[in-house]
Amino acid sequence: MGLQETIGIEIVSVEKGKAVVQLEVTEKVHQPFGYLHGGVSVVLAEHAASIGAAKSIEPDEIVFGLEINANHLASKQAGLVTATAEAIHIGKSTQVWEIKITDETEKLLCISRCTIAVKKKRK
């Protein structure tokens, strides 16, 4: 079982240049004060960027997160959050994605930028 299954990330849609994932905010993803853990938001953002990036590579390639940053703008104690990742740059060896995490009312909770490395699969 991967991290996405452990915390409950669900894929909504994936297409070249865009990916959308969701997560139900429950106690298992809270920080000590009862709010969505910032690290979980970063995991959600990188997961969305990674699955989106995977749609733009060749069958003999694989993607890895190279760098990520996140600005946490608002908190959330319960409910559904949605991460929408959109490609800013799709190159041969790197991709750059912007990810916005919103709640059910479209309130922006977190904005993130993720750089993805594209590598050849090892044989």
UniProtKB/Swiss-Prot annotation:
GO terms for biological process, alphabetical: menaquinone biosynthetic process
GO molecular function: 1,4-dihydroxy-2-naphthoyl-CoA thioesterase activity
InterPro entries: HotDog_dom_sf, PAAI_dom, Thioestr_dom
Reaction it catalyzes: 1,4-dihydroxy-2-naphthoyl-CoA + H2O = 1,4-dihydroxy-2-naphthoate + CoA + H(+)
Mutant lacking the gene: phenotype: Deletion of the gene results in an ablated membrane potential, indicative of a non-functional electron transport chain (ETC) and an inability to aerobically respire. Mutants fail to replicate in minimal defined medium and are killed in the cytosol approximately 4- to 6-fold more frequently than the wild-type strain.
Keywords in alphabetical order: Hydrolase, Menaquinone biosynthesis, Virulence
Presence of keyword Hydrolase: yes
List of catalytic residues: E46
Gene Ontology terms: cellular component: cytosol
Pathway noted in the entry: Quinol/quinone metabolism; menaquinone biosynthesis
Record bears the keyword Manganese: no
Enzyme Commission number, as recorded: 3.1.2.28
Gene3D superfamilies named in the record: Hotdog Thioesterase (3.10.129.10)
PANTHER family: 1,4-DIHYDROXY-2-NAPHTHOYL-COA THIOESTERASE 1
UniProt similarity note: Belongs to the thioesterase PaaI family.
Function in brief: Catalyzes the hydrolysis of 1,4-dihydroxy-2-naphthoyl-CoA (DHNA-CoA) to 1,4-dihydroxy-2-naphthoate (DHNA) and free coenzyme A. Production of DHNA is required for protection against bacteriolysis in the cytosol of macrophages and tissue-specific virulence in vivo, suggesting that MenI is required to protect the bacteria from killing in the macrophage cytosol.
Protein name, per record: 1,4-dihydroxy-2-naphthoyl-CoA hydrolase
Organism: Listeria monocytogenes serotype 1/2a (strain 10403S)
Name of encoding gene: menI
